[in-house]
């Protein structure tokens, strides 16, 4: 029979299910699956760490059984069963899952191969220094405490969190209708980013990217491209493409290669990956691999793929990226609880939320310290007052009937507060000595200073920020670690296509209007010496002319430098293939991000970006810079800054330095030349400005040519009026870098100014082109070597009023007379390569 007080309320089933499911959803979102933006922890993680703190499991304490930790957590704070709590504890101890583990485990806590941890009765754990930083000052009323599930104890709503743990360790979880997947970051970089936002709340995400370029996963690996990082940081959502770290080694027989995997993408099971590769080999999806084995040990990961003889490691690596978890996608979703509401946040908003939390913690801690200091100062004031009339105080106490009567007498006769009276009654006799009185006075004075400081902190926001800044800087100094994950520019879109591109020799032509094309070498048929040749570029089309010719392979890189100091990458196979008479297409069509007024100034053909080789860049005003070639080894679609250009200056040349014997020669418009060893120019970073290469005679003078030469070569200097001179390199006295140099050719009315200079041999030909379209090709065997001080000889008879505007070197095959490649070009007083 129903109780009279019970009331039955009829309710629509559909409405009840909606309300119940909504309550369940919010419970999962807030109390289970999503981390708090302030300390980066879910409730289960927070309760485990708090239970460990209550057990006093500090980094210096002995490890305790995980069964004890899980039991206390379950019994006191998290009533979900020990078997549910233990996996959370285990994950916080795994250094391949957490960038900065919060639990120091002892025993078998699993492996990157997916092996399970030992049972909790066998394993032991304690807190790490990272978790201590999260818990620090918890006992100073810095955060709210709430009753536990059965209201027998109190637990913190959030930890004080001395560092932004959510971004340091990341988080993942699936709630109802939403999920979070936050990547981990490097603590040192994150602190630098946080300091930027702390100093200037309007800090842009671009500025954050400069100090924190992207996530840093505990397993290392490689992030391909920055587009996913930028999307994640700006919008809170993005896709990061992660790759294993791979290198290639020669097999012991030196006839085959081995592909070695030394770091896994985040959350990839190594053992499962090895099985996956083996299965694909058996299915013939992956060909060219003879054996796969896991040689990992205590020193690190090492998965070896032995290739069959003659197989290309690059092609197989690309197939691994395509078909296996050697390359995976990390779907970042920066979703966290902010003020108890789930929000998808940008990197700036997430850092700002932690700063707000930390400022609140500092204020609450300061208020706690202030109250403590004021309470103690109040007691010390009573001591000092009592010590000043100690005889009367002692007499009053002796005449009192009991402690309560003595306390009442002290309050009534001397004006002490109850707290002061109790403290006086508890004084020991030795504290009445002169030395102890001095100590009391000193302590009181120190407390007054602290109280004044605490009040300033509570009144001034900037002082709170200063405290946070000092704490972060101390953490940065002590706990900064190198990045594990490297970020490489995305060349993956090119790789898959390149595998099917034939590796063949081609001829590349660039016109004066920067039209480019490529042609197979076979279209230039071999001829005997003295043949008429074939047309490789139609010189009759408008006013355009052939500016440069290169011999290259379809899989080579072209480094394209502009007059504004930018460098762009192109693969040779990306250039349009054209017929011999075709003009080609504008090269700027293939360069993303090129700015108005930016023109091609130099082009280099590079097969490999080798260490120990350099690029030499030269500007019109005589600035030179040497950069390691491997600094350009990470292609970027929108180019990079190769040289910082001064106002009014421009890049005119880029040269490839391959050995120590090569010298640098700079030629100026007014006939001066300087020669010096390239080691006089120290290697610099890509964004550096460079150093002085030559001092110009006056404001009308400028550099027209930069050459990299050896002492056994000769150089041809050509003037506007068709005159020139070929001299030995050794005839040009070596001078210091930055000097005015020596005369290269006499500048007078007959010769005109210097058009350019090119290093040549007897087997080279020079193509000279004039403003009126006249062109002549001169064999260098017909131009004798002359002394440096001579005026030179006539190279070409120009029509009246005509002048030379361009010169080009063509290397000639002495057996066939066939033009093979062009090394250098001067056009309108700018150097092309």
Curated annotation (Swiss-Prot):
GO terms for cellular component: chromosome; cytoplasm; DNA topoisomerase type II (double strand cut, ATP-hydrolyzing) complex. SUPFAM superfamilies: GyrA/ParC C-terminal domain-like, Type II DNA topoisomerase. GO terms for biological process: DNA topological change; DNA-templated DNA replication. The active site is at residue 122. Its EC number is 5.6.2.2. Few gyrases are as efficient as E.coli at forming negative supercoils. Not all organisms have 2 type II topoisomerases; in organisms with a single type II topoisomerase this enzyme also has to decatenate newly replicated chromosomes. HAMAP family: GyrA. A type II topoisomerase that negatively supercoils closed circular double-stranded (ds) DNA in an ATP-dependent manner to modulate DNA topology and maintain chromosomes in an underwound state. Negative supercoiling favors strand separation, and DNA replication, transcription, recombination and repair, all of which involve strand separation. Also able to catalyze the interconversion of other topological isomers of dsDNA rings, including catenanes and knotted rings. Type II topoisomerases break and join 2 DNA strands simultaneously in an ATP-dependent manner. This is DNA gyrase subunit A. It comes from Chlamydia muridarum (strain MoPn / Nigg). The gene is gyrA.
């Amino acid at each position: 029979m129903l109780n009279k007080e019970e009331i039955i309320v009829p309710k629509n089933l559909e409405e009840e299910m909606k309300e119940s499911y909504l309550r369940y959803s919010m419970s999962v979102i807030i109390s289970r699956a999503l981390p708090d933006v302030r300390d980066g922890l879910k409730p289960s993680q927070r309760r485990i760490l708090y239970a460990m703190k209550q057990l006093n499991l500090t980094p210096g304490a002995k490890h305790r059984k995980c069964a004890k930790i899980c039991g206390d957590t379950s019994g006191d704070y998290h009533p979900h069963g020990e078997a549910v709590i233990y996996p959370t504890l285990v994950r916080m101890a795994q250094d391949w899952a957490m960038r900065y583990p919060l639990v120091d485990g002892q025993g078998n806590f699993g492996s990157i191969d997916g092996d399970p941890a030992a049972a909790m009765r066998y394993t032991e754990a304690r807190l790490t220094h990272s978790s201590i930083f999260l818990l620090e000052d918890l006992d100073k009323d810095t955060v709210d405490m709430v009753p536990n599930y059965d209201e027998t104890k109190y637990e913190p709503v959030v930890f004080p969190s001395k560092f932004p743990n959510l971004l340091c360790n990341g988080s993942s979880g699936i709630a109802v209708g939403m999920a979070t997947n936050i990547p981990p970051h490097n603590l040192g970089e994150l602190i630098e980013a946080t300091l930027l936002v702390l100093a200037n709340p309007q800090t842009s995400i671009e500025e954050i990217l400069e100090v924190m370029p992207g996530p840093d996963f505990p397993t290392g690996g490689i992030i391909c491209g920055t587009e996913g990082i930028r999307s994640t940081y700006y919008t809170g959502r993005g896709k990061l493409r992660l790759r294993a770290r791979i290198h290639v080694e020669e097999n012991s027989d030196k006839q085959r290669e081995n592909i070695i995997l030394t770091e896994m993408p985040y959350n990839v099971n190594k053992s499962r990956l090895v099985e996956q590769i083996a299965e694909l080999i058996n299915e013939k999806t992956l060909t060219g691999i003879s054996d796969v084995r896991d040689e990992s040990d205590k020193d690190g990961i090492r998965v070896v793929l032995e290739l069959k003889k003659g197989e290309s490691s690059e092609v197989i690596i690309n197939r691994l990226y395509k078909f296996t978890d050697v390359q995976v996608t990390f779907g970042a979703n920066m979703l966290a609880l902010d003020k108890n509401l789930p929000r998808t946040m940008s990197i700036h908003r997430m850092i700002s939320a932690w700063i707000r939390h930390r400022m609140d913690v500092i204020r609450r801690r300061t208020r706690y310290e202030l109250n403590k200091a004021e309470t103690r100062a109040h007691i010390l004031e009573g001591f000092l007052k009592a010590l000043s009339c100690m005889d009367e105080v002692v007499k009053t106490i002796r005449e009192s009937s009991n402690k309560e009567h003595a306390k009442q007498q002290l309050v009534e006769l001397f004006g002490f507060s109850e707290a002061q009276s109790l403290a006086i009654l508890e004084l020991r006799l030795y504290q009445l000595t002169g030395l102890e009185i001095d100590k009391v006075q000193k302590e009181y004075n120190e407390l007054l200073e602290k109280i004044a400081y605490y009040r300033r902190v509570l009144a001034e926001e900037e002082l709170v920020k200063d405290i946070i800044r000092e704490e972060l800087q101390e953490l940065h100094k002590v706990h900064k670690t190198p990045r594990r994950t490297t970020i490489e520019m995305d060349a993956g879109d090119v790789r898959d296509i390149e595998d099917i591109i034939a590796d063949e020799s081609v001829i590349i032509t660039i016109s004066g209007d920067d039209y480019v094309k490529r042609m197979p070498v076979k279209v230039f048929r071999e001829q005997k010496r003295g043949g008429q040749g074939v047309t490789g570029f139609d010189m009759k089309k408008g006013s355009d002319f052939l500016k440069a010719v290169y011999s290259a392979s379809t899989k080579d890189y072209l480094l394209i430098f502009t007059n504004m100091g930018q460098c762009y990458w192109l693969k040779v196979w990306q250039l349009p293939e054209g017929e011999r008479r075709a003009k080609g297409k504008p090269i700027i069509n293939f360069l993303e991000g090129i700015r108005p007024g930016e023109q091609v100034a130099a082009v280099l053909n590079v097969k490999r970006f080798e260490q120990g080789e350099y690029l030499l860049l030269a500007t019109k005003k005589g600035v030179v810079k040497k950069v390691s070639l491997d600094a350009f080894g990470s292609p970027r679609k929108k180019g990079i800054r190769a040289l910082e250009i001064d106002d009014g200056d421009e890049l005119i040349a880029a040269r490839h330095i391959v050995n120590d014997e090569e010298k640098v020669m700079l030629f100026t418009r007014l006939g001066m030349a300087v020669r010096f060893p390239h080691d006089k120019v120290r290697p610099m970073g890509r964004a550096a400005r460079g150093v002085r290469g030559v001092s110009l005679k006056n404001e009308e003078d400028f550099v027209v040519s930069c050459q990299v030469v050896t002492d056994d070569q000769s150089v041809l200097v050509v003037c506007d009026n068709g005159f020139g001179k070929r001299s030995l390199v050794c005839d040009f006295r070596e001078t210091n870098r930055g000097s005015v140099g020596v005369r290269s050719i006499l500048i007078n009315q007959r010769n005109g100014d210097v058009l350019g200079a090119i290093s040549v041999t007897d087997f080279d030909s020079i193509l000279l082109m004039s403003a009126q379209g006249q062109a002549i090709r001169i064999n260098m065997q017909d131009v004798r070597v002359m002394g440096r001080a001579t005026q030179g000889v006539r190279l070409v008879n120009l029509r009246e009023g005509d002048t030379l505007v361009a010169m080009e070197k063509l290397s000639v095959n002495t057996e066939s007379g066939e033009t093979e490649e062009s090394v250098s070009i001067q056009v309108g007083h700018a150097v092309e390569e």
